């Protein structure tokens, strides 16, 4: 299996990029509300007639909805952040025809999280009815908020039950959270690199990530 296909091969396989609204206002677990909740997402493959072949893939903390293929740009507001690293799908080696997540059999959905910066409502988005960006005033979001917002997307696609939820790192924890919150809507779970306990070194790395985000905004 080629884990480093060239751009011409990636262009032959690309997802469908779309935006979806979550409930307005979308109420967060802490009681705060988002009046303009938008999710940027990509889909791969075809949803079957029974609408029961869908797989929801959660990306890692700094990932995007672009899980596979090649996408040169997203939108005018996102493109300044859409570096060369973003253009190539982060799981190309696993997603596609006859690959681990076989898009000839399954319909794959991957959405950028609320709080992300690749098209979904996040710190770099404008506040509702304003030219001002949220930046550090963006509400705190929990893993439950991220899962519930994505299940709103699943509802909008009229999918009652997911064939599987899949994710690695933060994405793996969100896959676990989905199974806990919506067990009746999830048949299978694949959670990678998301153990219940972590070593002190990982705590340090997480702290570094938090500080990098705080210093950036």
Predicted features by range, described:
Residues 1-217:
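Ligand-binding pocket scaffold of soluble enzyme catalytic domains
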């Amino acid at each position: 299996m080629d884990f480093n296909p060239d751009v011409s091969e990636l262009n032959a396989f690309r997802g469908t990029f779309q935006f979806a609204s979550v409930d307005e206002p979308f109420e967060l677990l802490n009681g705060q509300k988002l009046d303009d909740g938008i999710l940027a997402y990509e889909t791969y493959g075809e949803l079957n007639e029974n609408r029961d072949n869908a797989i929801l893939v959660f990306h890692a903390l700094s990932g995007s909805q672009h899980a596979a293929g090649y996408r040169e740009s997203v939108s005018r507001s996102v493109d300044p952040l859409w570096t060369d690293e973003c253009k190539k799908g982060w799981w190309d080696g696993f997603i596609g025809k006859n690959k681990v997540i076989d898009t000839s059999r399954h319909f794959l959905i991957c959405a950028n999280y609320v709080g992300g910066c690749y098209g979904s409502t996040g710190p770099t988005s404008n506040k509702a009815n304003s030219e001002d960006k949220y930046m550090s005033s963006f509400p705190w979001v929990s893993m439950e908020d991220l899962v519930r917002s994505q299940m709103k997307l699943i509802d909008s696609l009229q999918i009652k039950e997911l064939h599987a939820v899949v994710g690695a790192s933060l994405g793996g924890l969100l896959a676990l959270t989905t199974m806990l919150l919506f067990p009746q809507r999830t048949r299978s779970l694949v959670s990678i690199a998301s153990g219940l306990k972590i070593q002190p070194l990982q705590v340090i790395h997480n702290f570094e990530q938090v500080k990098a985000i705080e210093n950036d905004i």
